[in-house]
Amino acid sequence: MKIKALSKLKPEEGIWMTEVDKPVLGHNDLLIKIKKTAICGTDVHIYNWDEWSQKTIPVPMVVGHEYVGEVVGIGQEVRGFEIGDRVSGEGHITCGHCRNCRGGRTHLCRNTIGVGVNRTGCFSEYLVIPAFNAFKIPANISDDLASIFDPFGNAVHTALSFDLVGEDVLITGAGPIGIMAAAVAKHVGARHVVITDVNEYRLDLARKMGVTRAVNVAEQKLDDVMAELGMTEGFDVGLEMSGNPSAFNSMLKTMNHGGRIALLGIPPSDMGIDWNQVIFKGLVIKGIYGREMFETWYKMASLIQSGLDLTPIITHHFKVDDFQQGFDIMRSGMSGKVILDWE
């Protein structure tokens, strides 16, 4: 049986609608009928066919890794799922036999394979993944929100790396993940949550999500904002979401002594760092990749159920046949999360 899918068919800019074989269910797998998918920044990199994509992505391949769907097939070894369960899923497929996997630190697996990056993705009518990777969505969480659990998980993993209660938090980079991290920080009790960017559309979106201040660093100095807020000692926690060297270095300058930084944004490999700031301030820097399995997922569901409102971050919906419009708006930078409807 042939099904509809969005694939990287050629080693050049673009993503194409195509037909592929329906995936085959393995003994330990679930077959998921896709309801909605969201376009990730990673998918935009793959669309643009940048240096990272050229080194990483096999062609041809179905892409995508942010989704919600319904279980329609269950492998014979699988327990704990039923036909009709609504699920999203962890996009990092881990080996199960390295030291970190066996020690319960699966997010640190050294043999991680990415759905829609190293193997067939979710931008199709059906997806097969290991049942271990599926996460049941509580009934009171919408399909829209469930479809963005993967990037929301990046935000939650980054934000909850350190205690935020009563702390002043600086977030550099107001992409969807940065904005969601800001909303999480505010929800769990941070005092001042300041987010920086140069994209006014995204900063406005951050304001709608309740940040203390959204700062356009092309027009305003961070030092002035700190003074206006009555901050005398610098930020306690930094969440770096941009991969931008000047953003990271301004974060280092404005951190308090003993401050803690979580890095999710991917900087150029030759980024210069003022290490004196790190050493003499006694800063702690932690790299973040993916989500903790599955602690982050439980936290995500609980945060939404306890009143965290992420709905403003979802700005556009398109039918899957209009996927090109979705990619165009994502590439313009004038969007939050963009959802493609497969039903």
UniProtKB/Swiss-Prot annotation:
One of its GO terms (molecular function) is zinc ion binding. One of its GO terms (biological process) is L-threonine catabolic process to glycine. PROSITE patterns: ADH_ZINC. Zn(2+) 1 binds at residues 40, 65-66. InterPro entries: ADH-like_C (IPR013149), ADH-like_N (IPR013154), ADH_Zn_CS (IPR002328), GroES-like_sf (IPR011032), L-Threonine_3-DHase (IPR004627), NAD(P)-bd_dom_sf (IPR036291), PKS_ER (IPR020843), Zn_alcohol_dh (IPR050129). It is an enzyme of class 1 (oxidoreductase). GO terms for cellular component: cytoplasm. Its cofactor is Zn(2+). The active site is at residues 42, 45. Pfam families: ADH_N, ADH_zinc_N. Its EC number is 1.1.1.103. Catalyzes the NAD(+)-dependent oxidation of L-threonine to 2-amino-3-ketobutyrate. PANTHER family: L-THREONINE 3-DEHYDROGENASE. This is L-threonine 3-dehydrogenase. It comes from Vibrio vulnificus (strain CMCP6). The lineage of its organism: Bacteria, Pseudomonadati, Pseudomonadota, Gammaproteobacteria, Vibrionales.
